[in-house]
Every structure is written in structure tokens, then in C-alpha cells.
Swiss-Prot record:
GO annotations of cellular component type: plasma membrane; proton-transporting ATP synthase complex
Family: Belongs to the ATPase gamma chain family.
GO molecular function: ATP binding; proton-transporting ATP synthase activity, rotational mechanism
Name of the protein described by the UniProt record: ATP synthase gamma chain
Compartment list: Cell membrane
SUPFAM superfamilies: ATP synthase (F1-ATPase), gamma subunit
Record gene name: atpG
Superkingdom of origin: Bacteria
Species whose genome carries this gene: Corynebacterium urealyticum (strain ATCC 43042 / DSM 7109)
Amino acid sequence: MANLRELRSRIKSVNSTKKITKAQELIATSRITKAQARVDASQPYAHEITKVIERLASASSLDHKMIREPKDPKRAAILVVSSDRGMCGGYNNNVFKTTAELRKLLEDEGKEVVLYVLGSKGVTYYNFRNENISGSWTGHSQDPVYAETLNLRNHLIGGFLAGSEGTVDVVDGVNAEGDQVPGFDEVHMVYTEFHSMLSQVPKAHRLLPIKTVVEEEKMELGSDMVSDSADQVSAEVDFEPDADTLLANLLPQYVSRGIFAALLEAAASESAARRTAMSAATDNASELVENLSRIANQARQAQITQEITEIVGGASALGDSGESD
């Protein structure tokens, strides 16, 4: 049986670890509420700018590369959204697995893949495997700031507009080797979508070129151009300035919206994954302390029994010695 002193030392160590995991669980729980609120607050803007882009795309004759399908894409960029910190279960591994699946799919289509990584864990993961990273950003996974996404957006749009035949200058805030990196014809993003406290699903999404879905309105006999709903108006719209100018200026904003929304989802998912992992770790620590305490009690009882046996044996020996005298 294990030494009683060693058991007590292990119990003390596990209890110390339990305090850390419990604190991490409480911190993650508080962050989830804030992250969920930010995700919900971003939805109205995302919904409205999507409707505006679709309306402009239907009214515009602009042949912009950001909304035009490439004829022969040769290189695709993947933005991998990971975390800056660990202790979040399989959160990062699920992202890396989805990235590997997307990468294989793109390579099977004959496209060269370049990686852009957001989060220290992703940078460490790919550096350890000697994977080339074209650019990285760190320090913003838990609390993304919209202004910080602008450098990321500008770099990705610049690389996309340059195309696979060109190069793009590295903008401020991007960690990259050299002052220029190759351009690309597509931009994909892999991040974790928040569904609930217990469900976070890695998702692969094409960011550029933008897919615009314009739904044709069906008119029925006797209906007019104004919907019964107050927020759905189907009348013709005059744009000021013209639709082409508006669309060209709104497309970068739309990309920013897509990136920031994904980062908010990822932040909420990271906190939820960390809370789940830390809750499980705390429960395991409690169970381990209980088992170690039981073993320690058994060891203590065995020690006491042995001491009593030795005392009784010693007393008997003294008694026998006295009788012989």
C-alpha cells in the first residue's frame, strides 16, 4: 500500500489543481455570457448588410472580382481560427482536422493552398509540423475587436485582388516572413460555430469571392408590390450614389462583417469548450481526491492496527518474561 505521507501529498496537489480548474470554469462561464451577447448584437447588422449587398448586386452592372467566380483558380488561402490559450478540450484539434479536410479537397481540385493562422495555438501547431504559414495574427481570440480585423481584411482582400499571378505587400499587424507574399484566387475560413453551451461545430466557409444570392420575387394575381409585413418592401429603389459605386464600397465592409462575425462565434465557442473541459477536470479531480482519501484512510487504519498489534505483542512478551522470572 502506498506510503501515507505520499498519499497526503498527492491529495494536496490534486486539491490545488482542482482550485485552478474551478476558477477557469467560472471565468469561462462569465465570458460565455458576454460572448453570446456580442454574437446576438452583431446579427441585425449582418442581416441588413447582406440584404443590401443582394439588392445592389441585382441592380448593379459592376463586374467586380470580389463577386465574380474565378475561371481557373490556382491558389487558395485558408484562414484558420484557433485559440491563443489552451485548456479548452478538443476545440483546436477539431479546427485543425476540418482544415486538413478542406485542404485535401482544394488540393484534389488542383489548387495550391496557403495558410493564414489566427491564434497562438494554431501557429504552434503548424510550426511544429514544419508547415509554411504565410501570415499570422495572435492575441485576439478571446475578445475580438472590430478595428483589429481591418488589417486582416485588407491583407486578405489585397492578396485576393492580386490573384495567384501576383504578390501582395504585408500590411501592419500581420506576422509574416518578408515584405511580400503570393496572392491567391480564393479565400476560405475555418472557425468554430457556436450552437449551444454543449455544442460547438467547426465550419469551413468561403469568404472570397462573395456568393450573392438574389431571389426573384414571385407576383400573384391581385397582389401589389408592397408586402403585408412592415419590414418587407418590394418597391423599386433609387440608389444614391449609383449602385455600382455603393457596391464597390460596401464589399470590403461585407468581408469585414464576415470575418468579425466568425471571430465572435469562435470566441463564444472557445469559452464554452473551456468551460466544459474545466468542469470535467474539476469533477475528475473531486473523484480522484475521494479515491485517494479512501486509500489514505485505509493506509491509516492499517498503520493503527499494526501499531496496536505491536503494542499488544510487546506487552505479552513482557508478561511472559515476568512470569518466567
